Amino acid sequence: GCADEPLESLSGKTPLQAANIPAMDEIAATGHVGKANHVPAHLPAGSDVANMSLLGYDPNEFFSGRAPLEAAAQGIQLGPYDWAIRCNLVTIQDQIMDDFTANHISTEEATELLQFANSRISDSRLEFIPGVSYRNLLVYRGSESDQPFTMETRHTAPHDLTDKSVSNDYPRGPGSDLLVDLMNQSVEW
């Protein structure tokens, strides 16, 4: 971070302590310190919720998960009945989450795997969308009469399962059967 560690070459000071930073010194001397909470208590504490709030969007009204924000950042158009779902590539050994980043898979390799997965899906409403490295999306193109997911559809973030069994932490709630089926199929592909 900005403060870094004390260095012998700087007489035991951190780079920040040794730097000539009059503007920052002025702010520190005359500024005020406060705090703000940008994450409502009932929403997951994460940068997606906090950034939405910092940008002026009430997460109570607009937050529907990280994936729609990532889809928008990629220029993916979502209709009123479409769902963007985060699709992380992971490494599981003997039902234990070995690595939630798929060993830091390259974007190129992840794209190749997702293209293969798309070729195996017979449901035209589903499409895997490559992102960066292990962080990807699944887009479900729904309709007014076809909405399997709701805000009650839940999952456990892969990073929360590191070195733990994944056998009891599948998606749950409306539409989870579709997601679990895709997860199980992906093991066979």
State what each model feature region is.
Residues 1, 5-6, 25, 157, ...:
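Structured catalytic/translocation cores of nucleotide/phosphate-coupled proteins
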Residues 3-119:
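Active-site nucleophile/metal-coordination loop of metallo-enzymes that catalyze phosphate/sulfate
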Residues 66-186:
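A contiguous, mid-domain pocket- or channel-lining segment that forms the substrate-recognition surface
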